[in-house]
Each structure stands twice: as C-alpha cells, then as structure tokens.
From Swiss-Prot:
Record: residues binding Mg(2+): 26
Enzyme class: hydrolase
Annotated region described as G3, given as residue ranges: 81-84
GO molecular function: GTP binding; GTPase activity; translation elongation factor activity
HAMAP family (alphabetical): EF_Tu_B
Residues covered by region (G4): 136-139
Descriptive protein name: Elongation factor Tu
Subunit structure: Monomer.
Domain tr-type G: 10-204
Function: GTP hydrolase that promotes the GTP-dependent binding of aminoacyl-tRNA to the A-site of ribosomes during protein biosynthesis.
Length: 399
C-alpha cells in the first residue's frame, strides 16, 4: 500500500486530553473522531481502538500513548490520549507528546478531583500554553445549578495554577451520548472543537525560531576545515552566516562556509535537516559533542536550574534504592551526558522530603560541572552509568 502524502494545506497543532481517571477522556477522544468523521474530517475510532494504546519507548521509558488525527475547517490536529495516570506524568515530562494545548476533561458528576489538579499543575510546569475544558457527562446532571457550581470550581482551580480561569472556554459535553449518535450532544462536540480552534494558539513553526543545532559528531576534512554534524533543531542557517559555538567551554564565533546534506551542497539548512556544517577557523579539538551551534546572541550557557523530574521505578529499569540531596548523576542534555549534582529537592506539591524513591515525582535544583546551553521547557534525562533513571524538564534557569 502506497503511503499517502501528508497534505500541508492546514496549520498543524498537537493537542491531548488530560484529566482525572474515569472522567471520560478516551470516550471523548472517540466521540471527537466519530463526529468529525461524519464530515469526512477524521477516521472514526471506537473506545477500544484508543484504549488499547501500544507501548512506546521515549528516552528509555516505556509509555502507553494513543495517537489519533483529525481535522477541523481550519486545522489539522494530532491528538494524544493516555490510558493510565502514570503514562500522563511520563508523557508530559519527557515531552514524548509535545502539546501545544490540551482539552481538560472533567466530569460534571464529580467535579475536579485529585488528578484534575495534578494534570493542571503538570500542564503549567511543562509549559502547555493553553487549555480548553470539556465538562463531560452533562447528560447525567439534571440540575443546572450543580453544573454552574462545578464550572466555578474549575475556573477557581485554573486561576490558582496561573491559567486564565475566567477566559478559558468550558463546553458542556457528553462523550458517550455523542458516540451513540445523539444529535444534541454531537453538536456540543462541534462546539468544543470550535473552542479548541479559537483558544489554542497556533504554535510558532520551528523554522521561524532562531537557529540551533546540537553537535553530534565532529571531523576534519583535509584542506577544507572542520565539519560539525547534527540535526537542526530550529531555525535555518545560510552559507556565509556567523554562528556561535556555545557550551562546555567559552562561547566563540565562527562562520558557516558550507552546508551539506546527504553529500549534496545546500545554500541553507533548516529545522529537521540532518546536516554537516563546515566551520571557518575552527580546529577539530575546539568543538565537541554536546556543544550547540546557534544564531549569534540567541542563547547563553548555564550551570544551575530547577526542574520537574519523574524518577523511574525499579520495574522500569530505574534505581532500586532511594537517593538523597547531593546525589551526583549524569544529566543527558540534547546530545551528551554532563556530570552534575541534585543539590536540593521537594516533592512535586512543594512539601519537604528527606529522600527520593524510585517512582517519585519531584521538583529539583540541579548544578552542572560545566556550562551548557539549557533553556526553560527543555527536556533532559538523568542517567547513571549509561542507563536512564529519571526524566525531567527545565522549569527555571537559576544561573
């Protein structure tokens, strides 16, 4: 079967469903595909298709995630749904499913529960920019006042985590009734998707951001100079442009004298390309894996940061024993391991803990032995002797 060409005629946005267990995330996801399928904008999927999510490995961590895609009038969406709560935590921290926005599903019958709060907090910490609320199971609540109270409670909760509670749309839906073909509730799903279209901003394309390429390999070509290879993470780079080499040692400036891909010469490389960049006046020993090549002045190296971390359980290949403040692992950042220290930590809700157990989620302060190009929202892994024992996201740069 020939692979269909991916039509790029609409802007692409990544979203997901988040919220408390059994509040109807997967049923709602199925309902969205079914309602849009009637307009030819999706392939209808049932609960079982989505719930039997295959396992994936991301940064050495096994995660169950279901991916569905669909379109609205103006956009193409990739939508992720996770079966278990632990999968959400791992997914959002590793960035396996990068979300440009999320649909927070909350049952009108229960109101916000423990994981509702935890997912809002997680969305804030990992930098999900916008939310839309689907107030689910509204067919089971007859009293309009109860629905109003739940809505108020959700808005207050969103405010308390610094989301704009008053402005976020809350749409009353019933995933189940819409799946069963009830036209009243089908129109509510359409209303929800209109809210998603309007409230979740279109992400800035990687190509439009300032140039950055993490160095994976370096070699010298006799008579031509030094070549650094890697995948361009964002932006573009033209032949003749000045770039900075950042990280590990002092920042220095060089000029790109050639861009090569698949042994062909290019005028410019752009986000997503695997390229070799020929650099003027740079010796092979001046540049190493783990450094980044960037647009001048766009990034500075740092040694201290705060991060949100998920520590792997023993069964996931993590540690068997706890660790304490002062623990010295390697931080795998972009393309290299950098030795560092976890100088302090609290549990994810900010309460003090003496030690970190496998399976915990923590806020930590990390300090690296040499400066590297780290940025807020960037993902990293924590490793010990080459195996991943934790995954994290930088929540704040300290120094």
């Amino acid at each position: 079967m020939a692979r269909e060409k991916f039509e790029r005629n609409k802007p692409h946005v990544n979203i997901g469903t988040i919220g408390h267990v059994d509040h109807g995330k997967t049923t709602l996801t199925a309902a969205i595909t079914n309602v849009l399928a009637k307009k030819g904008q999706a392939q209808a999927q049932d609960y079982g298709d989505i719930d039997g999510a295959p396992e994936e490995r991301e940064r050495g961590i096994t995660i169950n995630t279901a991916h569905v895609e669909y379109e609205t009038e103006g956009r193409h969406y990739a939508h992720v749904d996770c079966p278990g709560h632990a999968d959400y935590v791992k997914n959002m921290i590793t960035g396996a499913a990068q979300m440009d926005g999320a649909i927070l599903v909350c049952a009108a019958t229960d109101g916000p529960m423990a994981q509702t709060k935890e997912h809002i907090l997680l969305a804030k910490q990992v930098g999900v920019p916008a939310l839309v609320v689907a107030l689910n199971k509204c067919d089971m609540v007859d009293d309009e006042e109860i629905i109003e109270l739940v809505e108020m409670e959700i808005r207050e909760l969103l405010d308390s985590y610094d989301f704009p509670g008053d402005d976020i749309p809350i749409v009353q839906v019933s995933g189940l009734k819409a799946l069963e073909g009830d036209t009243t509730w089908e129109s509510k799903i359409e209303e929800l998707m209109k809210a998603v279209d309007a409230s979740i901003p279109e992400p800035e394309r990687e190509v439009d951001k300032p140039f950055l390429m993490a160095v994976e390999d370096v070699f010298s070509i006799t008579g031509r100079g030094t070549v650094a290879t890697g995948r361009i993470e964002r932006g573009k780079v033209k032949v003749g442009e000045e770039v900075e080499i950042v990280g590990i040692r002092d920042t220095r400036v060089t000029t790109v004298t050639g861009v090569e891909m698949f042994r062909k010469l290019l005028d410019e490389g752009m986000a997503g390309d695997n390229v070799g960049l020929l650099l003027r006046g740079v010796q092979k020993e001046d540049i190493e894996r783990g450094m980044v090549l960037v647009k001048k002045g766009s990034i500075t190296p740092h040694t201290q940061f705060e991060g949100e971390v998920y520590v792997l359980k023993k069964e996931e290949g993590g540690r068997h024993t706890p660790f304490f403040a002062g623990y010295r692992p390697q931080f795998y950042i972009r393309t290299t391991d950098v030795t560092g220290q976890i100088t302090a930590f609290t549990s994810d809700d900010g309460s003090n803990v003496e030690m970190v157990m496998p399976g915990d989620r923590i806020k930590m302060t990390g300090e690296l032995i040499c400066p590297v190009a780290i940025e807020q929202g960037m993902r990293f892994a924590i490793r010990e002797g080459g195996r991943t024992i934790g995954a994290g996201v930088v929540s704040k740069i300290l120094k």
